[in-house]
């Protein structure tokens, strides 16, 4: 196996627009950090999506996203979507944004804020991965 010091330009062409769903959990913030690194190395455009399902503090999560983006020197578009009725879910809002935004990659945390540490992947992440029309990178 050989190691290349030159950047791989294939990644910069494949993953130009990246979506990062954020719920404030440790794994979603880790996903944001990885996405920021992608943007720094490959020039990707980042969008952070916070879905307000009334269980998270949107202002706190938005502030954390802005703080990390500012520290890294990368511009991040922050979108907030609300779950307005019982027929909508976090998953449906994320998938809706993927379709509307023409993203190339979704980087998401494996587990949300409420799941047991015994689980390797949460139901929301799994549903997004299964139904996403684009590539997904799952961060543990």
Name what the model sees in each region:
Residues 8-77:
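Small/aliphatic-rich secondary-structure junction motif
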Residues 1-4, 98-140:
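Gly/Ser-rich helix-loop-strand patches that form or flank binding pockets
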Residues 10, 37, 97-98, 129:
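Structural motif
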Residues 48, 78-82, 138:
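A structural preference for short, hydrophobic beta-strand core positions in alpha/beta folds
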Residues 3-9, 72-106, 114-115:
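Structural beta-alpha unit
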Residues 64-68, 72, 97, 127, ...:
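Alpha-helical structural signal in soluble globular domains
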Residues 30-33, 59-61, 89-92, 119-123:
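Generic recognition of short, well-ordered alpha-helical segments
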């Amino acid at each position: 196996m050989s190691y290349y010091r030159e950047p791989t330009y294939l990644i910069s062409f494949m993953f130009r627009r990246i979506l990062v769903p954020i719920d404030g959990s440790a794994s979603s913030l880790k996903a944001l950090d990885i996405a920021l690194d992608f943007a720094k190395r490959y020039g990707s455009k980042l969008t952070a999506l916070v879905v307000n399902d009334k269980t998270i503090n949107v202002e706190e999560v938005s502030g954390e996203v802005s703080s990390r983006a500012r520290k890294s020197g990368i511009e991040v578009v922050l979108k907030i979507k609300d779950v307005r009725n019982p027929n909508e879910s976090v998953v449906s809002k994320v998938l809706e944004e993927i379709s509307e935004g023409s993203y190339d990659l979704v980087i998401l945390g494996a587990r949300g804020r409420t799941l047991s540490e015994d689980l390797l992947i949460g139901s929301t992440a799994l549903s997004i991965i299964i139904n996403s029309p684009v590539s997904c990178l799952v961060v543990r």
